[in-house]
């Protein structure tokens, strides 16, 4: 599927609906016949837990594992993608992603690690949706580099729009 669209869902403010938007948009696209991969790029793993993974910290393979494979220039770890009953695939996250984000500061071309990890998956999907953490850290920068477009959920209040303005200026 060479026309795969990668979309990052981000806002520097927490609690504005990034994960909810990711899940609902993904399931909606899947119900209309699209092949969808949801990527949890937040070490809190809210997207992963939302899709029924009870203990994400016990997963053998996660987004962090795939990114480490890219950094080590090794084949991508297999078994990371979880098929969900709602018709979407999930690339889960767990607390290991916090260590990955910190470690990225010592990696050459660090902002391209996520892009390199998911580029090979584009042929299998119509859409790849990346649920970002509520900060403009290195993982969010990676998601923005990997993305073709961005959705910035916002609520009509001061702090939410402040997060939107900070992101747009970054």
List the model feature ranges, each with a label.
Residues 1-170:
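P-loop NTP-binding core
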């Amino acid at each position: 599927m060479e026309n795969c669209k990668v979309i990052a869902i981000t806002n520097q403010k927490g609690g504005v609906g990034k994960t909810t938007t990711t899940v609902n948009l993904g399931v909606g696209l899947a119900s209309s016949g699209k092949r969808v991969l949801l990527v949890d790029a937040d070490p809190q793993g809210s997207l992963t837990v939302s899709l029924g993974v009870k203990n994400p910290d016990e997963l053998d393979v996660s987004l962090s594992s795939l990114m480490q494979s890219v950094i080590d220039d090794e084949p991508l770890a297999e078994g990371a993608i979880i098929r969900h009953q709602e018709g979407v695939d999930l690339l889960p996250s767990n607390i290991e992603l916090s260590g990955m984000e910190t470690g990225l500061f010592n990696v050459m071309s660090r902002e391209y690690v996520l892009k390199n990890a998911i580029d090979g998956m584009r042929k299998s999907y119509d859409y790849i949706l990346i649920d970002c953490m509520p900060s403009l850290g290195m993982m969010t920068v990676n998601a923005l580099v990997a993305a073709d477009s961005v959705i910035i959920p916002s609520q009509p209040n001061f702090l939410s729009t402040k997060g939107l303005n900070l992101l747009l200026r970054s």
